[in-house]
Every structure is written in C-alpha cells, then in structure tokens.
Amino acid sequence: MTPRKAAQRTVLLVVHTGRDEATETARRVKKIVGDNGIALRVLSAEAVDRGSLHLALDNMRAMGVDIEVVDADPHVAQGCELVLVLGGDGTFLRAAELARTARIPVLGVNLGRIGFLAEAEAEAIDVVLEHVIARSYRVEERLTLDIVVRQGGNIIDQGWALNEASLEKGPRLGVLGVVVEIEGRPVSTFGCDGVLVSTPTGSTAYAFSAGGPVLWPDLEAILVVPNNAHALFGRPMVTSPDATVAIELEANGNDALVFCDGRREMIIPAGGRLEVTRCATPVKWARLDSAPFTDRLVSKFRLPVTGWRGK
C-alpha cells in the first residue's frame, strides 16, 4: 500500500473494545474531530475486534473523516500530536507506552470502574474533544522508572514503568528471601511475597493495595513497599527520586518475576538483582481539570467527608 500524505493534525485513538460504551464513544470522537479537520489513527486489532466499531470506521470514512488504520508497533504514535484513550487504567497504561515512545501527551477518558489515571468520564467526551481541538489542555510530566535485571553483574533484561515494578514470587512457590538496598547501602533482609517499587502516580494502584501511602503526583519520589513481609521492619519507605533502589534474591532460593505496570514480564533468577532508578524519559500527561489531587482522591475512592466545614 502506498503511504498517504500525513495530515496536518493526527490523534492516535486507543480503545478498550471490550466495553459496550466504547463503540458509541469512539463514534462520537470520530465525528467531532473529523468535522474539525483532525485525522484519526486507529490500531488495526481494535478496528476489527468489534464489528460495530469496524462498521463505525467505515461509516466515518464515507462521511469524509480521515481515518488511518495501522498495525500495532512501538512507534505507532509517531507523527501524532496526542494519544486519546477510551477505557480504564489498563488501557491507559497500554496507551502511555505508545505516547512515551513518541514523546507526546496522553489523555484518558474513563470507561472503566475507577479510572484513576483518566482525566474525564465518558459522559464528558464532548468537553474533552473541545479541549483537544483547541489544544487547550496543559501538559504535566510524570516520573517513570528504569528497571534493570542483573545476574553476576551482567544485565540480562530491562524495562520501564509508569506505575510500578512489582517483584513477585512464582506461582505456588515459597517465600522470597530478599535484601533491600537503597543508595548503595543495605536496609533490611526479610522473607516476603514480593516488593513493589512505585512512582507517585502508581501509589494509588498496586502499592496502595499492598499497604503503601498515597503520594501526590507532583511529588518527586520513589516508593518501596514490601508485600507481606515476614519482618519487624517491613514498612513502606519513601526515597529520593534520585536514589537507586536494588533488591537482591538469595542465591539458594527461588527465581522470581518482575511485572512492569502489570504488563511487561521479566524473570529474575535466584541470586539475581533488580535495580530501579528514575528514568530520563517521563510520560507526558494531558490535563484538563484544575481541581486539586485531593478532590480526585476523594471522588475515585469515594472517601467519606461528611461533617467537613472548611474555612
């Protein structure tokens, strides 16, 4: 196929096609942005995953909307100005990987349950699109993590994470014996089910479920949360964003797994070492809401605030 000339403005649309409301919301996106001369890029797997979404694409093309269907590729967002996400937090994390590679902002519209990473709910899609068309969103940079697995001093695998790196024992295996090291110094040795190393963005995700504190996203820090540690000092720790956090597995123990944002998996052999540092490439986050993070925390977790009188 002969590549067509790139449109002046292009938005990559990433959709959770398993949700019933995704097709109608995507159709609304295509109609509004198409009417304003913005081209859409859609992943081929999503275009054919649901028949109704595929039909919507054909209908929009017939109406003159510029739609490009492309195969999944790490560089698929190159040439786009924004990645627009319709889905939950899992879909957002998938889209953030594409946006980070292209170094463009990612904007989430929640179709899931909590949608902590999303900027708006599905019913506000028209308002979201007004901001996209006018480019009236602001862009924040969110800290990400570089993740390296070593064995005998050699790098055997590496990755990155926006939310967290989760060190976990394998299925049906015993407790992991680990040594936690921060800034090149040992902190504690203990047995555990795993250890999470999280960003402030990820502090409301798996790290929160494991007993970690909530960190405001504009705080620059790295959070270390032992998971079911058999130790007197098995408490979460908040470190400098410039610290190197390392976790060593005991040499005569079991292999372990590392999950980056619950998506990308690596294996750490017994005696191996996990190193986590701040990554030089952040995720660019498109923001519409000027309300403080406190409001989002209360809303998403449905925290009781009855009786508050304020100033």
UniProtKB/Swiss-Prot annotation:
Catalytic activity: NAD(+) + ATP = ADP + NADP(+) + H(+)
Gene3D superfamilies named in the record: Probable inorganic polyphosphate/atp-NAD kinase, domain 1, Probable inorganic polyphosphate/atp-NAD kinase, domain 2
Stored InterPro entries: ATP-NAD_kinase_N, ATP-NAD_kinase_PpnK-typ_C, NAD/diacylglycerol_kinase_sf, NADK
Sections of the chain in a coiled coil: none
Keywords from the named record: ATP-binding, Cytoplasm, Kinase, NAD, NADP, Nucleotide-binding, Transferase
Family stated for the protein in its record: Belongs to the NAD kinase family.
HAMAP family named in the record: NAD_kinase
Function: Involved in the regulation of the intracellular balance of NAD and NADP, and is a key enzyme in the biosynthesis of NADP. Catalyzes specifically the phosphorylation on 2'-hydroxyl of the adenosine moiety of NAD to yield NADP.
Protein name listed in UniProt: NAD kinase
Organism: Mycobacterium leprae (strain TN)
Annotated gene: nadK
